[in-house]
UniProtKB/Swiss-Prot annotation:
It holds the Pfam family ILV_EDD_C. Keywords: 4Fe-4S, Carbohydrate metabolism, Gluconate utilization, Iron, Iron-sulfur, Lyase, Metal-binding. NCBIfam families: edd. Belongs to the IlvD/Edd family. GO terms for molecular function: 4 iron, 4 sulfur cluster binding; metal ion binding; phosphogluconate dehydratase activity. It comes from the Bacteria. This is Phosphogluconate dehydratase.
């Protein structure tokens, strides 16, 4: 193992000792009760099986076969989740064939950030992660189940499913993806039309035609945003079957992987003599493995929030400092849009997960000695699935990249360091996705222009007020202010300014989409402005340095003057309409971005 990876892992283990121990005690107490439906009073159990067929009723009464919960984020507006419509039938059939039972335990909400970008609904996006976690807990709280299958793909859905199911860590749990849609027009072409539209050089009809040629079929969007990062990290955690992440939907291989996930969940139950609860899989080593994979592929910045919240749900204390230290020793091995021109289907064809995991294991950057849903040891994830006469089998994946413009071996990385940079200075702490920014654009020092929402920046751009070197500051966008929306709609405007030769950067206490790139952006700045963070002291014209090379985020103002400044008050309008008022209690409970921007942080860490 690489000494820095070991050092960071041991530090996390030491820091987490108390909370992890308390978590494991909770899990063991739940596991010791045996099949939970066996402890239910007769009337309660009768309610739980009332809608089952006679065969399933008899199986569930005997308590000697697994009852597998299906928790699904299906809806047919969200392209990535539309394929889940068929999955419960496939799962139940596969379980019946081995004498087990599957029950649809509950549905969880799934919103599409692509639909809500720049709209009021985006202010519910991050909160939806915590709603999904609570919905998962409600689904599993009936205590009818011996194992669980979680069906989810997209941005906040998988983190929410993870947080919720980890609170039922005594259950063996397998995550079931749907797979990416086939490749449409190139991401480069799509981005170019967006930028032309921002400049007034493309019509709305041309923009819509471009967008619909990109997002065109059931399955996950093909850029390397949060949804595909979710799949990659869950597989590296050992919660997917090997190679399951990026098989296209509605194919024979995808259907057989879904059936096998159901069978495997049943095999991992005490009833089948091979008990592997989720809590044994998601430990400190698995969390470190997920961070390493995130860094090696330049994954979504949203996971600098989500991984912290997921770790907390397992009693593990992960920090941005841990991620930063790992970023200095983990090389960048993948170039997927927005970090390059390839999409996730090209990544899969170039060698995909099996090649990536093999390289990171051989380089001592991943812990091999972990438990997974496929069995002990991460080395089994260097295999890939295929069908042999209709039967699902695994073979060794490629030992060399099939396209080094997309995926490279450890000895020829795209960069010696990972794709994320911790930003620090007198403006607070934040993160930057440097893998998506050309080296010549990673350092910007310029006067600031301050905005309190995306619409104001767009209006200033259209009025020609931003034609200069510029650090755009969009503040009061943090978790407690307005739910920390993504500010992805700013990317075309700032990209135009950069292409015109201006030095441009963004600084915000909000988020950017995992699809954002090109323009240097110090995001998730903490403390947020509404909590008295330094961004609230900034004034138009202040000179700010955003240095993605050295991780510096600093206002160049005399210290005495800076400390004497008053804090700008937060805008009083907003947070009303589109249901936003219903989430006020959740915003008030949100922890800082550095703590995962999570409404559960205080209660989960209360065990410390």
């Amino acid at each position: 193992m690489h000494p820095r990876v070991l050092e960071v892992t041991r530090r996390i283990q030491a820091r987490s000792a108390a909370t992890r121990q308390r978590y494991l005690e909770m899990v063991r107490a739940a596991a010791s009760k045996g099949p939970h439906r066996g402890t239910l009073p007769c009337g309660n159990l009768a309610h739980g099986v009332a809608a089952c067929g006679e065969s399933d009723k008899q199986t569930l009464r005997l308590m000697n076969q697994a009852n597998v919960a299906i928790v699904s984020a299906y809806n047919d507006m969200l392209s990535a989740h539309q394929p889940f419509e068929r999955f419960p039938g496939l799962i139940k059939q596969a379980l019946h064939e081995i004498g087990s039972v599957g029950q649809f335990a509950g549905g969880v909400p799934a919103m599409c950030d692509g639909v809500t970008q720049g709209e009021p609904g985006m202010e519910l996006s991050l909160a939806s992660r915590d709603v999904i976690a609570m919905s998962t807990a409600i689904a599993l709280s009936h205590n009818m189940f011996d194992a669980a299958l979680c069906l989810g793909v997209c941005d906040k859905i998988v983190p929410g499913l993870l947080i919720g199911s980890l609170r039922f860590g005594h259950l063996p749990t397998v995550f079931v993806p749907a797979g990416p849609m086939p490749t449409g027009i190139s991401n480069k072409e799509k981005a170019a039309v967006r930028q032309l539209f921002a400049e007034g050089k493309a019509t709305r009809e041309e923009l819509l035609a471009s967008e619909m040629a990109s997002y065109h079929a059931p399955g996950t969007c093909t850029f390397y945003g949060t949804a595909n990062t979710n799949q990659l990290l869950v597989e590296v955690m050992g919660l997917h079957l090997p190679g399951a992440s990026f098989v296209n939907p509605n194919t024979p291989l995808r259907d057989e992987l879904t059936r096998e996930a159901a069978r495997q969940a049943s095999r991992l139950t005490p009833e089948n003599g091979n008990y592997v609860p989720m809590a044994e899989i998601v430990d400190e080593k698995a969390i470190v493995n997920s961070v390493v994979a995130l860094l090696a592929t330049g994954g979504s910045t949203n996971h600098t929030l989500h991984l912290l919240a997921i770790a907390q749900a397992a009693g593990i204390q992960l920090t941005w400092q841990d991620m930063s230290e790992l970023s200095h020793v983990v090389p960048t091995l993948a170039r997927i849009y927005p970090n390059g021109q390839a999409d996730i289907n090209h990544f899969q064809a170039a060698g995909g997960m099996s090649f990536l995991i093999r390289q990171l294991l051989d380089g001592g950057l991943l812990h091999e000695d972990v438990q997974t849903v496929a069995g002990p040891g991460l080395r089994r994830y260097t295999r890939e699935p295929f069908l042999e006469d209709g039967r699902l089998v695994w073979r060794e994946g490629p030992e060399r990249s099939l396209d080094e413009a997309i995926l490279r071996p450890l000895d020829k990385p795209f960069s010696a360091e990972g794709g994320l940079r911790l930003m620090e200075g007198n403006l607070g702490r934040g993160v930057m996705k440097v893998s998506a920014v050309a080296p010549e654009h990673q350092v910007v020092e310029a006067p600031v222009r301050i905005f309190h929402d995306q619409a104001s920046l767009a209006a200033a751009f259209k009025a020609g007020e931003l034609e200069r070197d510029l650090v755009a500051v969009v503040r009061f966008q943090g978790p407690r202010a307005n739910g920390m929306p993504e500010l992805h709609k700013l990317t075309p405007f700032l990209g135009v300014l950069q292409d015109r030769g201006f030095k441009v950067a963004l600084v915000t206490d909000g988020r950017m989409s995992g699809a954002s790139g090109k323009v240097p952006a110090a995001i998730h700045v903490s403390p947020e402005a509404i909590a008295g963070g330094p961004l609230a002291r900034l004034r138009d014209g202040d000179r700010v340095r955003v240095d993605g090379v050295n991780g510096e985020l600093r206002v160049l103002v005399d210290d005495a003057e800076w400390q004497a400044r008053s804090l700008e008050p937060a805008p009083q309008d907003g947070n009303l309409g589109c249901g936003r008022e219903l989430f006020a209690f959740m915003r008030n409970a949100m922890s800082s971005a550095e703590e995962g921007a999570c409404s559960f942080t205080e209660s989960l860490n209360g065990w410390r």
